[in-house]
Amino acid sequence: MTTVHFVYPRDAARNSSPFCIGNEVGDRLARDYDVRFYGWRDKVKIEPKPGDILLGHPHWRRDSVFERSVRQPGWARRILMAPYADDLRQVAYYDRHMAQCDLFLAITGNYWFDRIEDATIRRWRPKMRHMDLAVNRAFFPFVKTRFNPPGQRKFLYIGHTAHNKNVGYLSRLQLQCESVDISWAGRGRKKIPGVHVLGFMDFSQPEALARVAAYDFMITVGAMDANPTTILESMAWGLIPTVTMQSGYENRAGIVNVPLNDVAAAELVFSKLQAATDAELLEIQRLGQEAIDRHYRWDRFYADVRAAIDGTESPPIRPATWKERLLIKTFDLVH
């Protein structure tokens, strides 16, 4: 049986990203292969045996397991699997491994994947395969059975305050838009002025889900966000995601797009949602539920992972230009 060395954060007690990816993919890998599991911060070096596969998420530390192992001779396949957005602060260090890897399974939304040719890392494109995220309904049950009255509908932001989340814009929306009332479930190093702070919430608990059901829309306004799992998780609950396209999803069923860094244009979107009839909101919700059942499924995600493992694709990429090398090296040094 083929041995797969899987490098990804995993924790069966945690259903949030990135653990949900490691859990869902890892459990399925274990059914089909002999699997060895590693955390992405582990500092071991793997010495492959003939036929072994390396699959997973690199870490920017040069003493981490993927970094130390990918250069070892003898791998049958080397497959990088990690989030992607056109933000060198997040992805520049992947370039250390790209030429050695057979494929890059890019976990991202359609917005970013459709624009790779315009990105600084466009030379990676031959190796990139689009991995649209998924959600497990067992952990994120449907709870939103009715919407609040017009003009009284509420928005929920779930997450932290890292730069890619663009929480300064979230604050401006709360302070300047008449049609939006935002609460924040989560923690972060920064404050988000104006929003109602709920703090950390354990969404595995009935009390937390009851609070979720009081909201109508999930909101996230990232500027450089691959495709946060909270979008699909909230949609599974029955909330309607209202998101910037730069949060990964562009013109997707069940998801409402909000303009990036344009308060006046965003207010137009929010005012329409506040004025919408129940029938209109229920139809958006229905389309989202249908998309989850049809497309945003872990079995579909894993099928693409397995195809990469069992396949033979290993397209070459061109060398970086001097300008590309300079930019990538500069941002790689940030870590």
Please give the residue ranges for each predicted region.
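A charged, aromatic-enriched C-terminal amphipathic alpha-helix characteristic of glycosyltransferases
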Residues: 278-331
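Donor nucleotide-sugar binding/catalytic pocket of nucleotide-sugar-dependent glycosyltransferases
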Residues: 102-142
